[in-house]
Amino acid sequence: MQYQLLINGVLVDGEGERQSVYNPATGEVILEIAEASPAQVDAAVLAADSAFAEWGQTTPKARAECLLKLADSIEQNALEFARLESQNCGKPLHCVINDEIPAIVDVFRFFAGAARCLSGLAAGEYLEGHTSMIRRDPIGVVASIAPWNYPLMMAAWKLAPALAAGNCVVIKPSEITPLTALKLAALAKDIFPPGVLNVLFGRGQTVGDVLTGHEKVRMVSLTGSIATGEHILRHTAPAIKRTHMELGGKAPVIVFDDADLDAVAQGVRTFGFYNAGQDCTAACRIYAQRGIYDALVEKLGNAVSSLKMGTPEDESTELGPLSSLAHLKRVTAAVEEAKALSHIRVITGGSQTEGKGYYFAPTLLADARQEDAIVQREVFGPVVSITVFDDEDQVLRWANDSRYGLASSVWTQDVGRAHRLSARLQYGCTWINTHFMLVSEMPHGGQKQSGYGKDMSLYGLEDYTLVRHIMVKH
């Protein structure tokens, strides 16, 4: 099993404190990995800074060729990547193989093509005797911090656009789920020039702070919690670094009385509980119009209770464990707080399961109120609440009454209503009669405290570039 860091094109052992990496399906230790030392973090950043002088000047075609080689290599090693991700995260193996790996490969291939399409605007003469041009240039060294819910996919979302734009990257995966990023490092070292891509391991306070605070790092890209985002912004503010933040969500799912309730129930069953609900866009905050509320509660209860929990290796498993014991405790505490409210009804689930591993039963909580914590806070687990509403204005007000602004969906047969709400919902993405669906060509990112900047799409590529004005006198 690959456990070494990638620094300046060489795989090396960490020199810092050793940390245990767990299998969440069993609670057992997979292996121990040594963190990067401060000196190794410094070496990785300096290697990236040195490599940028040449990599930043390579042609888009040359960068695209490297990204395509990496995509091919991931595809060729798909089963090994899937097994590592499943073992380290507890994800059902078939979900990683069939859903995640193809999407990861596609992200690298998309940005390989996008790199060759990015250009500055050809301008003209805005001052007599002078011609202006616009360039889009790479930023420099990017520090990327990837989360533990989709370790390899989020690494791909960060690496592909940054490298395609001509930046050099030092990435730190979560210390909870580092195995696929470290495997990726072993493949990347034979594809990219030394220093272009560096992969470290360690905790935020020992490695992340040193990395993001390094004077040679010009941009920090984070997918994580609001608290982590706040910390990084405070930490990097004195150096005025560029930042790219995706900080979670609490997606409202608005169901009107003309919606297809069977489609809603099956949609929430999938989109609310995929990856054990550990997804920033999870369909977790349901608003149902009064006329269909009781019927939807019943249908959702039946759908959610039919989800099959099991071991990641079982092809029939739909719901795996949560990623860590600490997170299991957080999810349990959030549900217990909700259950303590006299008006909350537990339709199904509501507790962790017996036996080994960090499993929490798929949970549906009915009669939640707008002010309840279960409606306002991100649980990031297999927990969905449902709240009754009366009219369009009320539900729009409630849906926007959130510090989050990442994703939302509207379920209705009224096209006009769908357009009205999607125009007024304060979310980076609004789906109509579906949820959760993402493609490489379209941007993903939030507003409000869900952060700023876009992943995927040409907008994501542009986020990793600088706009520069060139003026020529003639």
UniProtKB/Swiss-Prot annotation:
Q: Name one Pfam family in it.
A: Aldedh
What's an example of a GO molecular-function annotation for this chain? aminobutyraldehyde dehydrogenase (NAD+) activity
Pathway membership, UniProt: Amine and polyamine degradation; putrescine degradation; 4-aminobutanoate from 4-aminobutanal: step 1/1; Amino-acid degradation
CDD domains per record: ALDH_ABALDH-YdcW
One GO BP on record is: L-lysine catabolic process
Residues that coordinate or bind NAD(+): A146, P147, W148, K172, P173, S174, E175, D209, S225, I226, A227, T228, C280
| EC top class named in words | oxidoreductase
Q: Which UniProt keywords apply?
A: NAD, Oxidoreductase
Which EC number applies?
1.2.1.19, 1.2.1.-
What binding partners and quaternary form does the record give? Answer: Homotetramer.
The record's function comment reads: Catalyzes the oxidation 4-aminobutanal (gamma-aminobutyraldehyde) to 4-aminobutanoate (gamma-aminobutyrate or GABA). This is the second step in one of two pathways for putrescine degradation, where putrescine is converted into 4-aminobutanoate via 4-aminobutanal. Also functions as a 5-aminopentanal dehydrogenase in a a L-lysine degradation pathway to succinate that proceeds via cadaverine, glutarate and L-2-hydroxyglutarate.
Further comment: 4-aminobutanal can spontaneously cyclize to 1-pyrroline, and 5-aminopentanal to 1-piperideine.
Task: Spell out the family assignment given in the record's similarity comment.
Answer: Belongs to the aldehyde dehydrogenase family. Gamma-aminobutyraldehyde dehydrogenase subfamily.
Q: What is this protein called?
A: Gamma-aminobutyraldehyde dehydrogenase
Specify the species: Salmonella paratyphi B (strain ATCC BAA-1250 / SPB7)
Protein encoded by which gene:
patD
